[in-house]
């Protein structure tokens, strides 16, 4: 069963069970500056889980594009991904444990055809705060799960909370038995031996935690998440997500192009290219800050591993074409934004190639200087960064491949001192946003909104504001543009809007 079939089955199944199908939120959160990317299906729905009414009702389902960046360095093994898709269904004060579990069991066994004996589940074991979740366990037994396939764990494994305080509750997780040999007589889902693979998690938000402890919520919610890539891999009997149709065409092409064989490098190139394309398609652009730096890091790590495979970097355009052709049915925006994706990624490649060559050469010189130690100083890492623009994470990866450690603590101290020195020298010049508030700066601030609107008309929706700085002396407006722009047309649009004399309202 292909990934798109699994996705469609999921959405259709929950639609039949009264759920409204809602669109995936963008990878770049629109109104949540606390996170770089959308990391889970529930993230865009937090206001509704807290009680706000959703326009589509109390039963929702969707597929959500997600990016998680904490495991970038692990990509290259047989399971880690930066970009992934999460299938989810939610009850906002509607059904609860019994119906949620019954639907999950039905979908797994009837829609996907997974044999009952292949499934194991875990439930909350209970503690001094909250009781053992017998309701969930009994619901699984009623559905058809074998009693000796039900396990109980504590808060570390079967409890969910968003932060220190807030809505929380027990969860129940579903595991697929791969058929691999048990690691011991006590082998169970909590093992990390690979026999059991988690496939779905249903969170039951029935409590609220504050400084006084736990209290029952008036509105009980259900939040579930099923990883599409992992489920596709298991249903196809594959060992890794890279063996499925989601990656097969790009992996095959990389194998044809490579002059040095490395399955790890092929996986890194394939995964980081897909992730970068998804981020760019949703409006992300490389930079030295926040999500822009994550994107830059993904593209540059991909390029370094193309070099390791001795693949001509001019092939990058072809690799993008292969990915678009393979994924366009699942993600039509990739085809729509193909030229923008190419432009952004290829431009970043050109910027990095010289840095990579110089940085690797200087790194090797520093390694050759070491005699009785296998540790590279933080000073060297900082020198490569400060003098040659060589990213510290690339130095770290090179050192690891060469059997060396690096003193990251020393590097971080030097980097922090460098930041403080730079900040002190440019605090006034580069202060962001509205630095002062009077008639002049308010006029400039209004002008930024007019300019932003005009740019979107001239350039298109791919014109994204990246910052602004407003003082009584000047206005600075930062934005990115994927092609040459027409200054004259932008000014005409701004002046036309100004001439309308639209009344302005000050919101304080």
Placement of each model-derived feature along the sequence:
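The Walker A/P-loop phosphate-binding site
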Residues: 488-508
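A glycine- and charged-residue-rich anion-binding loop/surface
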Residues: 1-490
């Amino acid at each position: 069963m292909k990934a798109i079939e699994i996705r469609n089955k999921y959405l259709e199944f929950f639609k039949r069970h009264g759920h409204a199908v809602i669109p995936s939120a963008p990878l770049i959160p629109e109104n949540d500056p606390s996170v770089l990317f959308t990391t889970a299906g529930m993230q865009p729905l937090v206001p509704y889980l807290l009680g706000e009414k959703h326009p589509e009702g109390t039963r929702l389902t969707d597929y959500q594009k997600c990016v998680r960046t904490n495991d970038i360095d692990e990509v290259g093994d047989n399971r880690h991904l930066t970009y992934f898709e999460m299938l989810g269904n939610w009850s906002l004060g509607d059904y609860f444990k019994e119906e949620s579990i019954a639907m999950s069991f039905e979908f797994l066994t009837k829609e996907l055809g997974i044999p009952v004996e292949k499934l194991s589940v875990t439930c909350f074991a209970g503690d001094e705060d909250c009781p053992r979740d017998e309701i969930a366990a009994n619901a699984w037994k009623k559905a058809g799960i074998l009693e000796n396939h039900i396990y109980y764990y504590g808060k570390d494994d079967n409890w969910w909370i968003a932060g220190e305080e807030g809505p929380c509750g027990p969860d129940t997780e579903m595991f697929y038995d791969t058929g691999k040999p048990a690691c011991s007589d006590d082998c169970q889902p909590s093992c990390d031996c690979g026999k059991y693979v988690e496939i779905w998690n249903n969170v039951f938000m029935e409590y609220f935690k504050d400084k006084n402890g736990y209290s029952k919520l008036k509105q009980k919610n259900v939040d579930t998440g099923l990883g599409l890539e992992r489920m596709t891999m298991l249903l196809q009997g594959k060992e890794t997500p890279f063996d499925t149709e989601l990656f097969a065409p790009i992996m095959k092409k990389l194998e044809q192009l490579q002059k040095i064989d490395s399955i790890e490098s092929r996986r890194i190139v394939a995964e980081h290219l897909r992730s970068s394309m998804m981020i760019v398609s949703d409006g992300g652009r490389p930079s030295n800050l926040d999500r822009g730096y994550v994107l830059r890091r993904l593209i540059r790590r991909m390029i370094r591993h193309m070099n390791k495979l001795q693949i001509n970097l001019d092939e990058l355009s072809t690799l993008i074409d292969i990915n678009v052709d393979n994924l366009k049915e699942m993600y039509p925006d990739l085809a729509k934004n193909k030229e923008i994706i190419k432009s952004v990624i290829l431009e970043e490649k050109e910027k990095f190639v010289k840095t990579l060559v110089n940085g690797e050469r200087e790194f090797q010189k520093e390694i050759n200087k070491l005699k009785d130690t296998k540790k590279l100083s933080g000073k060297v890492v900082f020198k490569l960064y400060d003098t040659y623009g060589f990213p510290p994470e690339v130095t770290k990866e090179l050192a690891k491949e060469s059997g060396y450690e690096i003193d990251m603590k020393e590097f971080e101290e030097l980097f922090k001192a460098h930041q403080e020195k730079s900040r002190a020298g440019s605090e006034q010049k580069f202060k962001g946003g509205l630095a002062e508030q009077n008639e002049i700066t308010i006029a400039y601030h209004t002008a930024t909104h007019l300019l932003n609107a005009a740019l979107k008309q001239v350039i298109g929706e791919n014109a994204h504001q990246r910052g602004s700085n407003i003082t009584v002396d000047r206005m600075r407006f930062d934005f990115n543009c994927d092609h040459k722009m027409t200054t004259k047309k932008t000014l005409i649009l701004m002046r036309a809007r100004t001439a309308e004399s639209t009344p302005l309202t000050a919101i304080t």
